[in-house]
C-alpha cells in the first residue's frame, strides 16, 4: 500500500500559453556497468518486513517517489509507505527530530544540519535517488515563440533589476519576438527548498560577481516576487498569473503543459530541459558525492545547465531492525534499474547512471541494525 501526501505533489493538468515541445540531440547518459548481482538484490528488496514506513521531504522528487513507492507496494503489499512532500528543508528537520525513517532533499545535508544528528547514529548516509532538471516556466499571453534567456538576464528577473517583459536585456536575446510591455511577476518558493538551491546554485555559477542573493534553500527574495510553498504551489501560481515566470522541476512543467525557456548554457547554446539534455549535463560530472554534488552549468553543447540530483538521507546505525530493513530495501529497489529507476523516463526524470547506482548500493550496504548486522542483502 502507498500513502503519499498529495498537498505538495499534485501535478496540475491545466495549460498555459505556447508549446513546450522541442527536439533535442540524443546524448549518451553517464556510463558505467551495473553490478552483475543487481537482480538478486532486487528480488530480496521486495521481501522487506511489513508494516508502515514514514518519510518526508523534497517535492522535486515526489512525483517519482509517488510512482515508485506505489509500484513497490503493489509487489510487497504488506508494507505501507507514507511519503509527505513538504519541501527539502522541512524533510531534513523531520529527519533530525527522528519523526521519519528517511528524508529526501535536492541538496545534501550541510555540516550545520549533520551536527544535529546524534553521534551514536553513525555517519548520515546520503544517496542520490533520481536526476532531474529545473525548468524556467512562464505564462506569457500572446507569445507563441519559445523565450530565450541567459544567466545574467535570468538573474536580473529574479533579483528585481529587470522588471518588464520587453526590457532591452530580454528583447536582445529574442529578436523578432514581440514581447509585451507588461511587468514581470517572478514566482518563487516560500519554503526551504532544494529546488531553490539548484536554481540559485545555477544563478551564482552563471553570474559569480553579480548574483548577490546567495545559493541556499531559502532566499531573501525581492518584494516583487510571489512566494508560494512547494513545487506544486509555484506551478499553480504560474498557471493563475499571466505574465509570471518561475522555476519548477521539469515534470511539473510538462504535466501542466507550461511553456518554459531555453537557457543559454556554458557552451553558448540555448537548451531546453529534457531527458537528453539533463543527462548530458550530468555526463560532464560522472562522480558526485554528498560533499561534491553540484552539476549546474556544466560544459557541453547539449547540457541543460539547471540540473541536479535529489538525495535520500538515512541513518547509518538504525535503531530498529524492522524499520532499518524497510528503509534500505525500499531505497535500494527505488534507486536501481530493474526497480524504481525503470519508471524515471516516463515521469520526465533521468534514471541514475549505472556507476551512481553501484555507488548507492555500496553506501546502503554500510547501514547496520541494532547488533551491527548489515541490513541489505541479496
Model-derived features: where do they sit?
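Flexible loop/hinge segments at secondary-structure junctions
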Residues: 16-17, 25-378
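C-terminal motif of bacterial Sec signal peptides marking the signal peptidase cleavage site
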Residues: 9-14
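Terminal low-complexity, poorly structured segments
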Residues: 7-8, 30
